[in-house]
Amino acid sequence: MEHARKTTYARRARRFPHGLVTMNHMEALHENLWPAPYAGKPLNATVVVPGSKSLSNRYLILAALGHRPVRLVGLLRSRDTELMMDALRALGVRCEIDEQVDTTVTVVPPSDGRFHGGTKVFCGLAGTVMRFVPGLAMFADGPVAFDGDEQAYARPMKPVLDGLEQLGACICLLYTSPSPR
C-alpha cells in the first residue's frame, strides 16, 4: 500500500529545475482521505476508555453534552479529571463514581438539558478544564466564574477567550495578573 501511494504521488508531483519534487497539498490530502464510518441508527455500545487525563477529560465533556447517562469505564483518576468532574458538577452534571471500581464513572447530564450558572469553576492547572469548560458555560442559564492555581494565570488563554467572544460570550476579567491574556 505504501509503495502504491509513493507511485501515485510521483505521477502527480511536479519537478522543478533544481530537482525539488512537490505536489499540490490538496492533492496529497485527497490521496489520504478515507470514508468516515456512519451509523444508520443510534449506537448502544460499551467503550473502554484508555488511561489518559487529556482523553478522559474529553470523554467527560462529550458525556456531559449528551441527553442520557453515559457510563465511562477505565477513566483515569487524576487531579485534572477530578477538577473536570468538579467543573461539570458545578454546571449541574452528575458524575457518579462507582463504589466498587473507581475508574468507572457515570455521567448524567442535567435533566432540564441546560447547564447551570450562578456558580464558580476552579480549573487548577488543568488545561482541558480551562479551555473546554468555558465553552460549555456559554450554554449555562446564568454567569459562571472561573479561577485556577496562581500559575494558571500565566497560561495563554487569549485565543480561547477571543474565540468565545466571537461566538457571543460576555467575558469579564476580574484579576490583576500582569499578563491576563
Annotated model-derived regions:
Residues 17-23:
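Short, Lys/Arg-enriched N-terminal segments with co-localized hydrophobic residues
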Residues 24-77, 106-152, 177:
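Structural motif
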Residues 159-163:
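Active-site-proximal loop->helix
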Residues 168-173:
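A glycine-rich helix N-cap at a beta->alpha junction
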Residues 175-181:
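Conserved small/polar residues in nucleotide/adenosyl-binding loops
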